[in-house]
């Protein structure tokens, strides 16, 4: 992201590193935080600035099929509702869905996403709206004989994007899952990754059926099987992990594979509950993701934080499980770490100026007695008034020429493009 000049956000509350809150001013120069000037708060404040949220597992183009096939378990949902529609999607359709999904995320304070979908041009949708993205195309891992295409395509894409986006839209390594790829592909991609240094994005142990069928095929869990191919040697981030064992968690901690928790999607599809508190005990980095808008059915990371907090307290019969700060870090710095980034995810001098700015003046946010608790248990994406990516206000409710960068009509055009694609797909 490229920006010029100096910006100041004054008289704001902040979520700071070290699980601290503070009050004062944030100074942005270029694309980074240049200074944080703290001082005592002497009067009420209605502005909170927090790190931009990091959505670590998403399928943004699935805004095209939001809510389709509700009430079906995962395999039937995929085979009966989703795959038949996806088979008809054009690159134009996928681009429209990507742009709309990216805009939804920016409007809710998400500044960076790890997104998985197919289509050669789909990553451009994130670039178009000014959002950071780690993208990957799983389809190449499903069709036999496409390993070289996968490797060369990823290399050429990243070389091109270094110039166009300063590397902020970057392609990671990917397989859809253990059950939709083969050992030869995994070993080949592992060899390539030792040179390319890319992290692996994949689905893992989402359902009991998936987990047990892998054991029946290989005598190993999905994590153990994949680790044996070498494909996890460069680290990565595994979505779901609902049925992972303690031994799986130990492998993940050892190989620097983050667990991306998707509580809403897992509940909607009846998949179960990932044991994230146990994973954390065993040293796994736990991040947060929405999954796609067809299985969530929105991309609101505040809602994801709230649900993640509540379900694990209820399951454990223990209100001390997962503090608000634990949850906030899953949605910010843990997500950045999962993606291999140390320049985002925190409000600190020298970090990229990726900011989520929230209005605290809504009835459900007053009084603001405990800011971390308020963030996790009271806030919604709709409370976000501005989102800053690399120093640029990519979303700003107060902007006279339209909320999104690009002026009046930007959102209307994106909506029209999405609905035209939906009609073409016969939905």
Each predicted region: which residue ranges?
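Active-site gating loops and adjacent loop-to-helix segments of metal-dependent hydrolytic enzymes
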Residues: 64-96, 130, 134-140, 208-235, ...
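Active-site microenvironment of metallo-dependent hydrolases
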Residues: 1-24, 29, 332-427
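Metal-coordinating catalytic core of metallo-dependent amide/deamination hydrolases
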Residues: 122-242
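Divalent metal-coordination and catalytic microenvironments
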Residues: 12, 26, 31, 46, ...
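Catalytic core of soluble alpha/beta enzymes
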Residues: 206-230, 234-236, 241-254, 267-278, ...
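His/Asp/Glu-enriched, well-ordered alpha-helical/loop segment
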Residues: 228-235, 277-362, 378-380
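Alpha-helical scaffold segments that flank or form the walls of functional sites
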Residues: 66-131, 153-164, 417, 423-427
């Amino acid at each position: 992201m490229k920006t010029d000049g100096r910006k100041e956000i004054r008289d704001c509350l902040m979520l700071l590193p070290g699980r601290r809150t503070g009050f004062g001013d944030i100074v942005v120069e270029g694309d980074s935080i240049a200074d944080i000037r703290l001082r005592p708060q002497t009067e009420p404040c209605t502005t909170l600035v927090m790190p931009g949220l990091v959505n670590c597992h998403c399928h943004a183009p699935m805004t095209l099929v939001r809510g389709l096939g509700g009430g079906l378990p995962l395999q039937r949902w995929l085979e009966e509702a989703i795959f038949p529609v996806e088979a008809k999607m054009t690159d134009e359709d996928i681009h429209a869905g990507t742009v709309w999904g990216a805009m939804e995320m920016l409007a809710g304070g998400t500044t960076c996403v790890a997104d998985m979908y197919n289509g050669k041009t789909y990553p451009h949708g994130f670039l178009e709206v000014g959002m950071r993205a780690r993208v990957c195309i799983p389809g190449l891992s499903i069709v036999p004989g496409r390993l070289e295409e996968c490797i060369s395509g990823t290399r050429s894409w990243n070389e091109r994007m270094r110039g166009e986006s300063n590397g902020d839209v970057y392609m990671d390594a990917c397989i859809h899952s253990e059950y939709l790829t083969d050992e030869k592909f995994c070993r080949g991609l592992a060899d390539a990754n030792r040179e390319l240094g890319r992290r692996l994005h994949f689905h893992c142990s989402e359902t009991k059926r998936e987990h047990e069928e892998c054991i029946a095929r290989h005598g190993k869990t999905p994590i153990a099987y994949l680790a044996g191919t070498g494909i996890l040697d460069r680290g990565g981030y595994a979505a779901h992990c609902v049925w992972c064992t303690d031994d799986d968690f130990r492998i993940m901690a050892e190989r620097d594979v983050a667990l991306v928790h998707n509580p809403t999607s897992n509940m909607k599809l009846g998949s179960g509950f990932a044991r994230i508190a146990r994973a954390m005990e065993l040293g796994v980095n736990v991040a947060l993701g929405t999954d796609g808008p067809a299985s969530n059915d929105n991309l609101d990371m505040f809602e994801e934080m709230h649900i993640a907090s509540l379900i694990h307290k209820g399951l454990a019969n223990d209100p001390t499980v997962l503090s608000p700060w634990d949850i906030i870090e899953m949605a910010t710095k843990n997500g950045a770490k999962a993606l291999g980034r140390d320049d985002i995810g925190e409000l600190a001098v020298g970090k990229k100026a990726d900011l989520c700015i929230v209005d605290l003046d809504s009835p459900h946010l007053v009084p603001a007695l405990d800011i971390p608790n308020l963030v996790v248990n009271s806030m919604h994406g709709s409370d976000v008034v501005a989102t800053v990516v690399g120093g640029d206000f990519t979303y700003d409710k107060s902007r006279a020429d339209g909320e999104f960068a690009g002026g009046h009509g930007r959102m209307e055009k994106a909506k029209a493009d999405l609905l035209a694609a939906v009609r073409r797909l016969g939905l």
